[in-house]
Amino acid sequence: EIIGAEDLVAKRAVNESVAKKILSAAKHWEDKAKATGEDIRKINPIPANMAAGISSLEEKSLGAIAKSGTSPIQDVLKYAEMPKGSGLYFVDSWMSSLSLPLCLTACGATIMLYQMGGGKIAQHPMMPSINPTVVSPFLYLTGNAIAYSRAPDNFDFDASPIMTEGASIPEMGTKLLEHLSAIASGTMTKMETLNYAEQLELYMEGPVL
């Protein structure tokens, strides 16, 4: 998700050691893909990305990076490793939208915001707050007015008024924070009310039988 623009992410590291970890993580996954005969820089963007208007791997990575905001990156965490302090952390993990939520929950996340792309919704039986095992509500967000109009029941928040109605980013940010607070206080997410669930996916490196 950062390959092609990893140098920009590294610049946000709190120190040189963390910057090296970020660059090393990107290189690790790129080398791992090459070892299987695939070149991430050549197979991206995928057809679905291009259909949505993305023209290059770098552009795709810049979009992913933009979602992280501008805060300094405190450290790089391994899959399911909990942070040792407050602030923004980079999790060195596979990009699958099916395995990442479980990873972030194991890292200690108690609520998650997911910017919906062009794929279908994904939700996990262990994730909803109504389940007594893992408490981590999952909110789906979009900034695409067309996507929201086609499937309003799938999204918890629509930020498209910034582009369609001239709403300001701070204004929509306040509305999102208010909605986030309501979810954290017990209001159910759209996926919880739909009761839509998929199989839980654990990420494991290497062949799996």
Where do the language-model regions lie?
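Anaerobic metallocofactor- and corrinoid-dependent redox/one-carbon enzyme cores
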Residues: 1-209
